[in-house]
Amino acid sequence: MNPLQEVIFCRQFGNQHRVPKPYYRRKTYLCYQLKLPEGTLIHKDCLRNKKKRHAEMCFIDKIKALTRDTSQRFEIICYITWSPCPFCAEELVAFVKDNPHLSLRIFASRLYVHWRWKYQQGLRHLHASGIPVAVMSLPEFEDCWRNFVDHQDRSFQPWPNLDQYSKSIKRRLGKILTPLNDLRNDFRNLKLE
């Protein structure tokens, strides 16, 4: 595994609403750990989008090759800069469904195009299929830093307002994952008639 450079980690995993100066393009990076249920690390790597192939699809290919033994259970933790698009969400659900010996958890730094219905549906589909999607907060950023960054033995230094940004993104994800039936009931309870 080639560890991420510190500057790449801070720029790409930064959860600020706006890119700080100097401006740069935020790309998708996916860092994952493949472990046995008792915690033994089998493999870890950092992936990113490649020529019209999303990082999630590269991840599926890698995991397929590493987990051929279906008698062995595996746990996978993913740290990703952007939450999956609807297509990748669908592919991840199908992959985990076809491989019941795998357990997958996703931690996203930011929500990708979260205001669009299809992207919200993708997140709901992951959640309903038993693939938890959560927002990265300080412990996840620290773990990602320790395991995937060439940090030269320096500890993670949170950027300003990291906690506030995480809480804001978590609230948004919570609203997306709230079943619509609950919202309908809330409107009925308003008794606007």
Curated annotation (Swiss-Prot):
Which ranges carry the CMP/dCMP-type deaminase domain? 24-126
Question: Where in the cell does this protein reside?
Answer: Cytoplasm
Main subcellular localisation: cytoplasm
Key words, A-Z: Cytoplasm, Hydrolase, Metal-binding, Zinc
Which residues does the record give as Zn(2+) binding sites?
H54, C85, C88
- Outcome following mutation: V96I: In allele A3Z3; haplotype 4 and 6
Q: Which InterPro entries does this one have?
A: APOBEC/CMP_deaminase_Zn-bd, APOBEC_Cyt_Deaminase, CMP_dCMP_dom, Cytidine_deaminase-like
Molecular function terms from GO? cytidine deaminase activity; RNA binding; zinc ion binding
Q: Which PROSITE patterns match?
A: CYT_DCMP_DEAMINASES_1 (PS00903), CYT_DCMP_DEAMINASES_2 (PS51747)
Q: Which CDD domains match?
A: cytidine_deaminase (cd01283)
- Which GO BP terms, alphabetically? cytidine to uridine editing; defense response to virus; DNA cytosine deamination; negative regulation of single stranded viral RNA replication via double stranded DNA intermediate
Question: Which cofactor(s) are needed, names only?
Answer: Zn(2+)
Q: What is its EC number?
A: 3.5.4.38
Summary of the tissues where the protein is detected: Expressed in peripheral blood mononuclear cells.
Q: List the Pfam families.
A: APOBEC2
What does the subunit section of this Swiss-Prot or TrEMBL entry state? Answer: Homodimer.
Function, in words: DNA deaminase (cytidine deaminase) which acts as an inhibitor of retrovirus replication and retrotransposon mobility via deaminase-dependent and -independent mechanisms. Selectively targets single-stranded DNA and does not deaminate double-stranded DNA or single- or double-stranded RNA. Exhibits single-stranded DNA deaminase activity (in vitro). Incorporates into the released virions of the virion infectivity factor (vif)-deficient feline immunodeficiency virus (FIV) and suppresses FIV infectivity, probably in a deaminase-dependent manner (in vitro).
Q: To which protein family does this belong?
A: Belongs to the cytidine and deoxycytidylate deaminase family.
Q: What is this protein called?
A: DNA dC->dU-editing enzyme APOBEC-3H
- Which gene carries the instructions for this protein? APOBEC3H
